[in-house]
């Protein structure tokens, strides 16, 4: 790479010693304006046709956008026709304003008014580039010449609006604002304010775009605070943001600029737009939501929003995209899985409304996602993640020591295969290894008990098992079925067996519900678990003992 200090110049800082934005927070939603159908559309490899535009437009209305930039009707017949469709057939609610973009050229302004005939409170968004670079390289004009372009357009637009009977709203953008000296931007914007003469009933939207993101977010915030302090007729001016994401900090720049006094944000769903994209209004809205602020955009069905986005834009959303990506509610790390598992249990026990789960800044259900994919299992996964999946998807609550034991089995499989294991595969492995054991030597068939003669409190357990398919009858003594069956099996197998831990729970509700029992069996070589599932809890317990005994036999045979 070439010497950066020679080729590039650092962006100058803004001198505001008494800046106030660092101590502020965002406590209310801004006015939102979607520019998906204009800025987003013009950035697509294949611009939207009518059907794709119409579907996106309907989604934006359903989400609650009150201002929607529908295109650049003077630039193409397609955009003009779509504007007419929105006006005539778009079923636009009375509280929604259609916005269109136009350059400061008389013939384009005339065509724009034609496109909006009959619209309710439409916004005419006019702009011209004001940056030092474009004044010098593109237009060859001085500040006065650039200001005159904006002033002339403002006069023509306000005159045409008055002749059309009023009802129009106005927005002006000094395009490439972040590349414009603040004093120059202020001079041009104040000249437009003087022409438009905004009132409390019809405020001027003054859009200050980060057309190209050129500096750190704090500098954009300083620029916005400076403009808010110095613009004329501030009480009747809506300060609007239009950030891009060239440096990857569009979200942060927008949030700091809102803290600096901005009232409005223009952006796109999931950040589609020129180059690296416009600011992502969905992420902005959900960031506010997770801070306890109503974003006033409906993101409850984020999968549907994603589906329309991908259909209309013919683009896919990355797996790690905030709030919507396939993997954003997923943990592979064992320690993360364990923390999520414990957090989910704690929040159920606490039964209070505040969301507090490690590694999940938002409840996935709030955006229409499920808990099913929160934890996924690969070679980095721990016992907590495996336990969570079995509990959440199949109602199996593994004892802690069994979590450790089964995790080693799953770890071996993921290490060998090098892939993620889906929940169904994990469940099937658990059932095969601990419950059905298709290749096991011993199978439980049935049992009954009867008193042990003169021994008070002791019963004889008579059980039927199969040993490699051959029916065997065994007997043992104990204080109950489990104790007696352990005694019978120990004698039959010639192995000293004892129960170190036992637990059970139901798998479903109702009179025909199955139960699962877990037995940690202690034997001369250590401890191993078994599990049994049956509609009869005693039978489930005896099956769990057989399961553990089979695993002891496997261990001894190695």
Curated annotation (Swiss-Prot):
Catalyzes the condensation of the acetyl group of acetyl-CoA with 3-methyl-2-oxobutanoate (2-ketoisovalerate) to form 3-carboxy-3-hydroxy-4-methylpentanoate (2-isopropylmalate). Pathway: Amino-acid biosynthesis; L-leucine biosynthesis; L-leucine from 3-methyl-2-oxobutanoate: step 1/4. It comes from Agrobacterium fabrum (strain C58 / ATCC 33970). Pfam families: HMGL-like, IPMS_D2, LeuA_dimer. It is found in: Cytoplasm. This is 2-isopropylmalate synthase. Residues 437-558 are annotated as: Regulatory domain. GO terms for biological process: L-leucine biosynthetic process. PROSITE patterns: AIPM_HOMOCIT_SYNTH_1, AIPM_HOMOCIT_SYNTH_2, PYR_CT. Residues 30-303 form the Pyruvate carboxyltransferase domain. One of its GO terms (molecular function) is acetyl-CoA C-acetyltransferase activity. Belongs to the alpha-IPM synthase/homocitrate synthase family. LeuA type 2 subfamily. Mg(2+) binds at residues 39, 242, 244, 278.
